[in-house]
A protein has these predicted regions:
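Proteins enriched for Cys/Gly/acidic motifs involved in redox and nucleic-acid/cofactor modification
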Residues: 1-166
Length: 166
């Protein structure tokens, strides 16, 4: 499984959590290979700023073309872009096997005939250099700024309990 991460460090943490679940289910994972050849590719998209949307769409199109050419078997898209524009993406890029919203890894695993490994919940396969890793302490936003799409994409602000963080 190749997991491609677009956008912010929160997406990277989501991808690392997904990688751990795939590995616990017996899959070999590669992160950000950017080479469209393999069995399964999952693209974790960004839909916040215009340049990130374009990069996400271009990446999806590149891998959709690779799927058409037979260089990969299954293509899945998740993350902010597919959360916000799922219907439009489904219509425009039918090569994608399925679009999932913002980090809906449980349904992705289920659709692949696998389950969530409870002992791995909250643990992840770190992809950053050994001297640091990102810590995702919250998700969403409670503000409704006219220029910002984060509340629309990620929902209301939710903090992780401090017991999980410490």
């Amino acid at each position: 499984v190749d997991i491609i991460t677009m956008g912010c460090s929160k997406n990277l943490v989501d991808s690392e959590l997904l990688m751990k679940q795939f590995e616990a289910n017996g899959y070999h994972c590669v992160h950000d290979s950017k080479k469209p050849n393999g069995e399964i590719v999952v693209i974790n998209t960004c839909g916040f700023i215009e340049s990130a949307k374009e990069e996400s769409i271009n990446t999806i199109l590149e891998f959709a073309q690779a799927k058409e050419e037979g260089r990969l078997k299954q293509l899945y898209v998740m993350g902010c872009l597919s959360q916000r524009y799922q219907k439009e993406l489904e219509q425009e890029i039918p090569q994608v096997d399925k679009f999932y919203g913002k980090f809906n890894y449980k349904n992705l695993l289920k659709d692949l005939g696998k389950g969530v490994i409870a002992s791995c919940n909250g643990t992840r396969s770190i992809t950053t250099p050994r001297h640091y890793a990102y810590l995702k302490i919250s998700e969403g936003c409670d503000r409704s700024c006219a220029y910002c799409a984060i509340p629309l994409i990620t929902g209301k602000h939710v903090s992780r309990p401090k017991e999980e963080l410490l």
